[in-house]
């Protein structure tokens, strides 16, 4: 995600994350330290405290969840809320290094061994505790006002994260459809003696899954081109990006479900690839933007914000 964010920002004339691209090319592994339990503000707020120091750096204290590749990352990009600076509050985006084992600051970052999940087990997205974890001044990328914000780093994270997520889950749907097609061409009906690929109900279900699946990739590709092409969607950007993520993850769930329905009881065994896809695709409902957030974002883009009791009718 972070290398993509660096590109989006550079394309818009902001080179604050050039070091991310250089270090990633040298083999450094950048973790994504944004998610926090119960923080539905996501990029617009944080429960992690960002305490400034006199040298311009920050110390972060809080808990991040779903930190992918937790056992092996070497850098973490994260955010926190600075409530103590005189000109604040600020949302602070910065990067911290993983301390060497036995180093004096080793206890500042604790990786819990808690990734015991239904699916996506290979990502090892464990919980990370931050205890005054330090980002020096040259690794403090941006300070932006809390709340919805068009700052390049906010747009960069949102656009790259949503588009990449949509692509991953679209890929899960594609693989499930591929497995379903292969399976029904081999399974035979005792009643008819023909393969299930000749059964009209099976054919309809696979076709229905494929029709839904085929609609997603062009949407992902179109938005990705718009991001790269600096297209200005204005206030619609966040609704477009959250929308494609939700449509992709929800469609992938339907496609996987249909694939299992036509593939028979063998797909219920844990050793079956469709069983793994069934477990993995469920994670899509937990990634931001969730269904509720996407609907709220779309409504705000089209209808404006919800009126407060003191607002007068237009």
Language model regions located:
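Glycine-rich phosphate/cofactor-binding loops in nucleotide/flavin-utilizing enzymes
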Residues: 265-314
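Generic structural signal for well-ordered, non-transmembrane alpha-helical segments
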Residues: 171, 207-214, 242, 246-253, ...
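Short, structured patches in soluble enzyme cores that scaffold and shape functional sites
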Residues: 34-36, 52, 64, 79-82, ...
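Glycine-rich phosphate/pyrophosphate-binding beta-alpha loops
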Residues: 65-70, 161-165, 284-287
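A short core secondary-structure module
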Residues: 63-111
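Glycine-rich beta->alpha junctions and the first turn(s) of the following alpha-helix
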Residues: 117-213
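Glycine-rich flavin
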Residues: 1-72
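C-terminal helix-coil-helix/basic helical segment that borders enzyme active sites and/or dimer interfaces
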Residues: 214-246, 257-268
């Amino acid at each position: 995600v972070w290398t993509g964010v660096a590109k989006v920002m550079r394309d818009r004339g902001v080179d604050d994350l050039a070091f991310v691209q250089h270090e990633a090319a040298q083999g450094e592994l950048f973790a994504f330290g944004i998610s926090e339990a119960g923080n539905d503000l996501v990029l617009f707020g944080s429960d992690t405290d960002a305490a400034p120091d006199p040298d311009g750096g920050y110390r972060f204290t809080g808990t991040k969840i779903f930190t992918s590749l937790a056992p092996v990352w070497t850098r973490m990009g994260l955010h926190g809320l600075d409530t103590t600076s005189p000109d604040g509050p600020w949302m602070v985006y910065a990067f911290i290094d993983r301390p060497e084992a036995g180093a004096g600051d080793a206890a500042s970052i604790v990786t819990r061994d808690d990734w015991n999940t239904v699916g996506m087990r290979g990502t090892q997205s464990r919980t990370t505790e931050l205890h005054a974890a330090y980002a020096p001044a040259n690794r403090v990328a941006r300070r932006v006002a809390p709340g919805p914000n068009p700052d390049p780093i906010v747009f960069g994270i949102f656009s790259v994260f949503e588009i990449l997520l949509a692509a991953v889950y679209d890929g899960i749907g594609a693989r499930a459809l591929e497995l379903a097609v292969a399976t029904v061409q081999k399974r035979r009906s005792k009643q008819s003696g023909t393969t299930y690929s000749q059964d009209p109900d099976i054919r309809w279900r696979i076709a229905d899954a494929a029709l839904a699946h085929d609609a997603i990739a062009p949407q992902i590709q179109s938005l990705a081109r718009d991001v790269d092409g600096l297209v200005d969607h204005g206030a619609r950007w966040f609704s477009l990006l959250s929308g494609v993520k939700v449509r992709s993850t929800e469609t992938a769930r339907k496609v996987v479900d249909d694939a299992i329905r036509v593939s028979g009881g063998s797909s219920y065994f844990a050793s079956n690839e469709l069983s793994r896809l069934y477990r993995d695709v469920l994670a899509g409902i937990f990634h931001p933007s969730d269904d509720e957030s996407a609907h709220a974002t779309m409504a705000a883009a089209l209808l404006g914000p919800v009126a407060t009791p003191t607002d007068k009718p237009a």
